[in-house]
From Swiss-Prot:
InterPro entries per record: AAA+_ATPase (IPR003593), GAF (IPR003018), GAF-like_dom_sf (IPR029016), Homeodomain-like_sf (IPR009057), HTH_Fis (IPR002197), Nif-specific_regulatory_prot (IPR010113), P-loop_NTPase (IPR027417), Sigma_54_int (IPR002078)
Binding-site list for ATP: 231-238, 294-303
SMART domains in the record: AAA, GAF
Subunit structure and binding partners: Interacts with sigma-54.
Keyword ATP-binding: yes
Secreted as UniProt keyword: no
Function: Required for activation of most nif operons, which are directly involved in nitrogen fixation.
Protein name: Nif-specific regulatory protein
């Protein structure tokens, strides 16, 4: 008879462990998982009261899941280490068996009466929950009377095995939760860094054309409107797109970029909309598209003028309905995405030729911003050159590299078909290949007929913009900050004549922002910094 009971107990243990193992590996919802585990234990052990307590950051054991408790009993399930039977199990890290709770002085009766309503004895079995030698909590079972079908030793053994499985799951869950929290914090820090990197204050452009671009960006960024950025390749459309995102209410959401020209029609559809498992050869699992990934943020479609007419129709539907289906799927997915597009093509001509759908053109051309080519804002070139030289110095840990006036004249007279991107490459290439710390005109590839721009575009007759020395700044600059009388006349006074006073005046007018004061004085930020040091002018902090 004992052998039969032992066999039944072993079979019960195997079945119970198997079912609980499946539950623990089926979900990342810890609360739901633990509840299902306790339900299995309650059914297999034929008991109505099962409790699971875990150690909290407060240093207390707290009930996190239970079967057979009232709300009041559940809320009272808190124990200090060593307090009551539960606290004692945690403290000693050993199981405790109580055959009659009415006779046990350690029992506090917070989660169970000492006797059943009909006076029947209530017994108790509790085991510690451990993982990698770390105490995590306590698993307890209450029973009215004694079980006729199994011994207490069998129950202790079963509960210990279950507690070990629970401990491993809890430890893994907490590890994943900690990593997720760390990733979220890193994401927030990266987002703050990107916001600083791509804010408009860091976009170089003192020219009137770029100031107009900045004004349009500030005006349109807070809205939900679809935007179209237009300009030649290399003018900085992506930088402006990111600035729009980080100036908008969606700045804490994702910024997702897709280069439409780099993907075929089939790949572009899968990339934007995602795909279901088995949608095509090689689709081993479902995959979210860029529209889903950009939910709550901004989707930047670069080179939108290069997409095929067939795909234009699919994109139009998404823009109209704000929903789509994954490739190979039938379920509609709704998204909240702000769309920013960019192109270097003449879309109006493309529409006239039938190469671009007119209805899609009207959808994306809600707010249009034109980014001027570098040759139309040559006054920005000295500041861009200085910025790229400083970037090169920091990235390569080099000494300060300067550019001679003759070298700057070459830069100012270049056609720059590749715009800012080409300018940056030219500065980096020249600074890398030169010897010494001063770039002269002989260091440039174009002076050796090794530059494609020199071959394709002969220098024009445009006069370079002269950087006015500080001492030559005269009264008209005072009008930049002067009060206006509404008739187009400045009423403010001209800046002071002394160089030190002029520096202080410019800094005061610009709120002690060095970059703004430098632009007002038509000098570079580096020159501004040198001048402030030279005259021992302390920069005020606000």
């Amino acid at each position: 008879m004992a052998t039969i009971l032992d066999d039944r107990s072993v079979n019960l243990e195997l079945v119970t462990i198997y079912e609980i193992s499946k539950i623990l590996g089926s979900s990342l919802d810890l609360s739901k998982t633990l509840r299902e585990v306790l339900n299995v234990l309650s059914a297999h052990l034929e008991t109505k009261r099962v409790l699971l307590s875990l150690m909290q950051d407060s240093g207390e054991l707290q009930l996190v899941s239970a079967i057979g408790l009232s709300y009041e009993e559940f809320q009272s399930g808190r124990y200090r280490v060593g307090e009551g039977i539960t606290g004692k199990i945690f403290q000693t890290e050993t199981p405790i068996v109580v055959r009659d709770l009415a006779q046990e002085p350690l029992f506090l009766a917070r989660t169970s009466p000492r006797q059943s309503q009909d006076g029947e004895v209530i017994s108790f079995v509790g085991v510690p929950i451990k993982a990698a030698r770390e105490m995590l909590g306590v698993l307890c079972v209450f029973r009215d009377g004694q079980s006729p079908s199994r011994s207490v030793d069998h129950e202790v053994r079963l509960l210990t095995m279950v507690a070990n499985l629970i401990g491993q799951t809890v430890r893994l869950y907490r590890s994943v939760a900690a990593e997720r929290q760390q990733l979220q914090e890193e994401k927030r820090q990266l987002s703050r860094q990107l916001q600083g990197k791509y804010k408009l204050d860091n976009v170089i452009g003192i020219s009137k054309a770029m100031q107009e671009v900045f004004a349009q960006v500030h005006q349109s960024a807070p809205s939900r409107s679809t935007m179209l950025l237009r300009g030649e390749s290399g003018t900085g459309k992506e930088v402006i797109a990111r600035a729009i995102h980080y100036l908008s209410p969606r700045k804490d959401g994702p910024f997702i970029k897709v280069n439409c020209a780099a993907l075929s029609e089939t790949l572009l559809e899968s990339e934007l909309f995602g795909h279901e498992k088995g949608a095509f050869t090689g689709a081993q699992g479902e995959r979210k598209g860029r529209f889903e990934l950009a939910h709550g943020g901004t989707l930047f479609l670069d080179e939108i003028g290069e997409i095929s007419p067939a795909f234009q129709a699919k994109l139009l539907r998404v823009l109209q309905e704000r929903e789509f289906e994954r490739v190979g799927g039938s379920r509609s997915i709704k998204v909240d995405v702000r769309l920013v597009t960019a192109t270097n093509r003449d879309l109006e001509k493309a529409v006239a030729k039938g190469e671009f759908r007119a209805d899609l053109y009207y959808r994306i051309n809600v707010v249009s911003i034109f980014i001027p080519p570098l040759r139309e804002r040559r006054e920005d070139i000295p500041y861009l050159v200085e910025h790229f030289l400083e970037k090169f110095r920091v990235e390569n840990q080099r000494a300060m590299v300067a550019m001679s006036p003759q070298a700057m004249k070459v830069m100012m007279n270049c056609y720059w078909p590749g715009n800012v991107r080409e300018l940056e490459n030219c500065v980096e290439r020249t600074a890398t290949m030169m010897r010494g710390d001063l770039i002269t005109e002989v260091h440039f590839s174009c002076q050796q007929n090794k530059c494609l721009t020199k071959v394709l575009h002969e220098p024009g007759q445009q006069q370079p913009v002269v950087v006015v020395p500080l001492e030559r700044i005269s009264a008209p600059y005072g009008a930049i900050f002067a009060e206006w009388d509404g008739q187009g006349q400045a009423t403010g006074a001209a800046p002071p004549t002394s160089e030190r006073e002029r520096l202080i005046w410019a800094m005061e007018q610009c709120g002690w922002v060095q970059a703004k004061a430098a632009r007002a004085l038509n000098i570079s930020p580096r020159q501004m910094g040198y001048a402030l040091q030279k005259f021992n002018i302390e920069v005020k902090k606000f």
